[in-house]
């Protein structure tokens, strides 16, 4: 089936440029027209290749360089900061721009181009003499990229253009070579297929998002849907899936951009606004839904799709099929390692959207010098383990049975570890596993490269060494009393280790027999096969390396057979190898000796055998290299037949590594096992109480959830306060200086579902909120948690509204961004969600902000979600103190807590303790002083504060409103807009006149001035006269 090469559309407002022939003598590539008659045969060859990849950068091999021409050269020169030169002009006088990179350093340049969002197409020279044998045995019929080839002068022989072929296409999501992949990065591609029914139809809008991890050999897909009038819901779901997939690039059908429909245009625009990766438009035929089933059946070698779980999901089929086509196109071959299909559903995982991931700093810190959660947690010893840990953190489990399976495995490791410590001189199991895992290479990516026929000799040696080390894992676990015949996660993983997989053992044995211990980095110069692997290769190598021995053996055999004791062998550039006999013995030469040269005292002969040895010697090196490459390709094919077993081994090692990493963190930081259960003490009484209470408000609160954390700690803050080298094999335990706090929501003892958190800035409100979310996240990942005890119920999502940032490019202010995030929470949260909201409403006028925050609290209580709500609006604390302050009996579901702080000698002491009740002050001026605000500014702030407090104190008692139920709403109105009846207003004015005699604003300014003067006086340095004058001066100020 013909396919269209992928093309990156870099201009959102402009359709992808098509490359088509204008006529038989011209080509259109992008916006340029090339007349073939104006170019040399080599440039015609280049243009005929380039026309298939109009948006990609074509690296065209010429001898020891990869060259780029025309617009490609200009773009690459700008990105790589290399010299832009020219390759003369065409016949029409147009300059041919050119830039190049050396082939031996091409990997680094390719990596930079890919990182810049470019697609790189590699075109290699095909040396017929060196690769003719290879091509017969190479399924891809493609040469190995990077092989050393002869200097290219555009022609391999007189009048003949050297043959070249595109061997692979490198894109951000399909690269598998470690030299091209950034550290701790997993290249993936997503395909999105959308089906929008007709406007008069009642069918829902559906979409499928599928992900391909070529290195891991997995396809993952999820189908989402929404009503036609609720497209925002579908987009929100899609963003959630994309946050979990974290794609390096995205492919869509060109039909989506070519469509004239408004819906398609809106979707395309929305994707470009929200996807932070290249969007590639591929042929609509790749997404063809009628052909998708056949493509998938062929790839997975099945007759029907029923066993794959997507038989009734046409969009999932088409998007997965498009990814398979894309992989085949970019790799220029079939991709047998792509052999696992995973179907995901939202209910499978605890959902954390992209904003919440960033607010919690899970993978990237907010500030450049910050610390992310993953950097503290990820001390896995293998590359596969490090990648798997990231995947598990992006996919926290919902099912408690699966979570407990992981927790049981960690418990087993820790229990065995404690037993080992009790035996003097024994290294703990966790430490031993770390040391063994550290010796295992990246089996996952090596296996993928074997499937793509691109694995290097050193890859194979690493694979063999890794298999040998993984066999030791079985020994360690067995010696610890864990058997593969037992139940549980660890025994199940042991069944996938070499001891239980004979095919994996045969792979290691084959590599040990075939590859030398220290092979070269590349196959281009040979020297990687071990002696004894192939008789013909050994003969050619022996012939070249031991020619003198071969000749000596031949001479000795001829002397014995022909009785010619004076027979000698020699060599010169004219005659080549020859036998030489003295004149007296020449007449006794055997009949098969052919006279070649007569000298004064001797004669020289050749034989067919000697001529054969000469020919083989002169070509032995070339023949040996050709044979070695052929054998190496055959070896990769043999190893490729065991890809499934190698992927099983890689997955098992990665899971053991992650479990052992969790165990090590539990030891190092004294983490405890959480209890994952929906049931708590006296749960039936609690459920009945909540049901009755919420039924009064008309709320549905079935299947409520709860959390109960005792002495919880923040993972990252604790690690920063107590730095430990957890990457070492024997990390030390630490004593924490972190102040631990409890967090209880929805339990029997504390049925409240919203904590109203007040207290000073810098007191630890945000830290307390984040630590609660991180503890819940770790528990759902199947890890022990930083707490003395933790009971976690069924949590479906974690939402956060923390921090502030604007979106200038999107035209959104800080407050607008805050409101968008708040709206998302209020629309998406359920009674099983954990919500963190920090200072909602602070980005606008105080009155508006307070009103919004008040309404948000009411809405969150109605939803019934577990909420941590931090605020500096102290008016909100009344919601928990008096049920009349809100629209319903919210006092049963809101509890005030505050961050403790003390003021000692004018200095603020932050205690970082969470205590019941509302805070008395935010201590804003104290924090400003700690930040270094100038003293003059602080004094001015104090005056302004006293002035406003004085005015507030002058109001009469009868200003209050009788209706307590509306008091909070009235208090948030601007004082300038309050109206009173005439009698109250007159009373206010009279009372104000009376009190202003005692409290005058100018007088208070003088008091501040007096305070400053007194602080500047040094009593010990004053003379009696100066002290006397000063007393009069102070009295004048007081009497003012």
UniProtKB/Swiss-Prot annotation:
SMART domains: MUTSac, MUTSd. It comes from the Bacteria. Residues 1-10, 130-143 have a biased composition (Polar residues). Keywords: ATP-binding, DNA damage, DNA repair, DNA-binding, Nucleotide-binding. GO terms for biological process: mismatch repair. Belongs to the DNA mismatch repair MutS family. This is DNA mismatch repair protein MutS. It comes from Psychrobacter cryohalolentis (strain ATCC BAA-1226 / DSM 17306 / VKM B-2378 / K5). The lineage of its organism: Bacteria, Pseudomonadati, Pseudomonadota, Gammaproteobacteria, Moraxellales. The gene is mutS.
């Amino acid at each position: 089936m013909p396919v269209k090469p992928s093309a990156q559309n870099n201009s959102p407002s402009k359709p992808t440029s098509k490359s088509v022939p204008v006529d038989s003598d011209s080509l259109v590539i992008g916006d340029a027209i090339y007349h073939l008659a104006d170019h040399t045969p080599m440039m015609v060859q280049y243009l005929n290749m380039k026309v298939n990849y109009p948006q990609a950068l074509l690296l065209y091999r010429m001898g020891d360089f990869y060259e780029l021409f025309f617009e490609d050269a200009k773009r690459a020169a700008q990105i790589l900061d290399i010299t832009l030169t020219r390759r003369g002009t065409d016949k029409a006088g147009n300059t041919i721009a050119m830039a190049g990179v050396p082939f031996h350093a091409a990997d680094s340049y390719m990596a930079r181009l890919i990182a810049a969002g470019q697609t790189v197409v590699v075109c290699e020279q095909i040396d017929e003499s060196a690769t003719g044998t290879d091509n017969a045995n190479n399924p891809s019929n493609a040469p190995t990229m990077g092989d050393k080839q002869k200097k290219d002068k555009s022609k391999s022989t007189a009048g003949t253009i050297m043959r070249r072929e595109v061997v692979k296409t490198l894109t951000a999501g399909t690269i598998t070579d470690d030299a091209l992949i950034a550290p701790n990065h997993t290249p993936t591609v997503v395909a999105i297929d959308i089906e929008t029914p007709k406007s008069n139809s009642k069918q829902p809008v559906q979409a499928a998002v599928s992900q391909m991890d070529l290195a891991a050999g997995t396809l993952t897909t999820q189908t989402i849907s929404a009503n036609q009038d609720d497209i925002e819901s579908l987009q929100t779901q899609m963003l959630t899936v994309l946050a979990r997939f974290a794609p390096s690039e995205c492919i869509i059908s060109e039909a989506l951009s070519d469509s004239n429909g408004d819906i398609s245009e809106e979707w395309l625009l929305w994707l470009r606004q929200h996807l932070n990766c290249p969007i590639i438009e591929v042929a609509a035929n790749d997404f063809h839904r009628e052909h998708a089933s056949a493509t998938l059946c062929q790839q997975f070698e099945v007759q029907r799709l029923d066993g794959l779980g997507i038989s009734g999901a046409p969009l999932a089929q088409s998007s997965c099929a498009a990814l398979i086509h894309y992989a085949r196109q970019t790799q220029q071959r079939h991709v047998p390692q792509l052999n696992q299909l995973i179907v995901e559903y939202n209910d499978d995982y605890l959902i954390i959207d992209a904003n919440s991931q960033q607010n919690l700093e899970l993978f990237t810190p907010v500030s450049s010098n910050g610390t992310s959660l993953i950097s503290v947690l990820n001390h896995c010893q293998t590359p596969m383990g490090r990648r798997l840990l990231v995947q598990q953190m992006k996919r926290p489990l919902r099912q408690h049975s699966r979570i407990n399976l992981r927790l049981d495995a960690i418990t087993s490791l820790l229990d065995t570890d404690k037993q080992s410590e009790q035996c003097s001189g024994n290294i703990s199991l966790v430490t031993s596993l770390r040391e063994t895992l550290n010796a295992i290479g990246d089996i996952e990516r090596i296996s993928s490269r074997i499937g793509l026929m691109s694995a290097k000799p050193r890859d194979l040696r690493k694979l063999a060494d890794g298999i040998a080390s993984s066999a030791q894992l079985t020994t360690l676990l067995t010696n610890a009393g864990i058997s593969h015949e037992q139940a549980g996660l660890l025994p199940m993983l042991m069944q996938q280790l070499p001891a239980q997989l004979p095919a994996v053992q045969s792979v290691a044995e084959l590599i040990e027999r075939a590859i030398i211990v220290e092979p070269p980095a590349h196959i281009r110069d040979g020297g990687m096969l071990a002696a004894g692997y192939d008789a013909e290769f050994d003969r050619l190598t022996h012939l070249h390396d031991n020619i003198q021995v071969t000749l000596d053996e031949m001479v000795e055999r001829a002397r014995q057979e022909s009785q010619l004791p004076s027979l000698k062998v020699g060599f010169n550039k004219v005659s080549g190898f020859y036998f030489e006999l003295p004149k007296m013995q020449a007449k006794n030469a055997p009949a098969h000796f052919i006279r070649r040269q007569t000298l004064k005292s001797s004669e020289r002969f050749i034989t067919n055998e000697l001529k054969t040895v000469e020919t083989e010697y002169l070509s032995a090196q070339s023949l040996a290299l050709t044979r070695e490459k052929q054998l190496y390709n055959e070896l990769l094919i043999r190893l490729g037949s065991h890809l499934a077993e190698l992927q099983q081994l890689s997955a098992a090692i990665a899971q053991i590594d992650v479990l052992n990493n969790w165990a090590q963190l539990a030891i190092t930081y004294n983490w405890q096992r959480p209890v994952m259960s929906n049931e708590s003490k006296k749960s039936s009484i609690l459920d009945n109480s909540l049901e009755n209470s919420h039924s009064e408000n008309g709320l549905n609160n079935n299947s409520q959830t709860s959390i109960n954390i005792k002495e919880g700690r923040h993972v990252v803050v604790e690690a920063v306060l107590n730095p430990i080298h957890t990457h070492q094999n024997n990390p030390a335990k630490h004593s924490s200086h972190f102040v631990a706090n409890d967090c209880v929501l929805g339990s029997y003892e504390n049925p409240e579902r919203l904590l109203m958190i007040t207290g000073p800035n810098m007191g630890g409100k945000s830290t307390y909120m984040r630590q609660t979310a991180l503890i819940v996240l770790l528990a759902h990942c199947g890890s022990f948690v930083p707490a003395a005890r933790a009971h976690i119920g069924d949590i479906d999502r974690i939402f956060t509204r923390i921090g502030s940032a604007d979106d200038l490019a999107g035209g959104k202010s800080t407050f607008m961004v805050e409101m968008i995030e708040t709206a998302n929470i209020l629309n998406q949260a359920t009674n099983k969600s954990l919500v963190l909201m920090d200072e909602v409403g602070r980005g606008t006028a105080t009155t508006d902000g307070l009103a919004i925050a008040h309404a948000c609290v009411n809405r969150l209580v109605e939803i019934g979600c577990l909420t941590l709500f931090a605020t500096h609006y102290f008016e909100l604390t009344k919601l928990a103190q008096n049920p009349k302050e809100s629209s319903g009996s919210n006092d049963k579901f809101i509890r005030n807590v505050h961050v403790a702080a003390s003021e000692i000698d004018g200095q603020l002491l932050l205690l970082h303790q969470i205590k019941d009740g509302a805070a008395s002050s935010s201590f804003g001026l104290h924090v400003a002083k700690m930040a270094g605000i100038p003293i003059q500014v602080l004094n001015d702030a104090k005056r302004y504060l006293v002035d406003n407090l004085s005015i507030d104190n002058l109001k009469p008692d009868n200003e209050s409103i009788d209706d307590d139920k509306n008091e909070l709403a009235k208090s948030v109105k601007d004082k300038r807009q309050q109206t009173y009846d005439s009698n109250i207003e007159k009373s206010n004015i009279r009372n104000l006149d009376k009190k202003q005699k005692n409290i005058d604003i100018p007088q208070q300014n003088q008091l501040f001035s007096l305070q400053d003067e007194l602080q500047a006086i040094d009593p010990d340095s004053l003379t009696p006269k100066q002290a006397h004058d000063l007393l009069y001066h102070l009295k004048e100020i007081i009497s003012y």
